[in-house]
Swiss-Prot record:
A molecular-function term among this protein's GO annotations: structural constituent of ribosome
Protein name, entry field: Large ribosomal subunit protein bL32
Gene Ontology BP annotations: translation
Composition bias, Basic residues: 1-18
Amino acid sequence: MAIVPKRKTSKQRKRKRQTHDALKVSTLVSCQNCSVQTIPHVTCKSCGFYKGRQVLKVKSS
């Protein structure tokens, strides 16, 4: 025999449990060097700067 729930899960209980399943909106900050929107605590992909100093060499196009 399979395991069966003893009581029906109410809409309120189900929805309260599902409140944490939503995707979070990621925050963006502007780069101090080139003012491009980037993810915080990550090297800027357009200029290669992180915390005011050059970390990556970026090919200029």
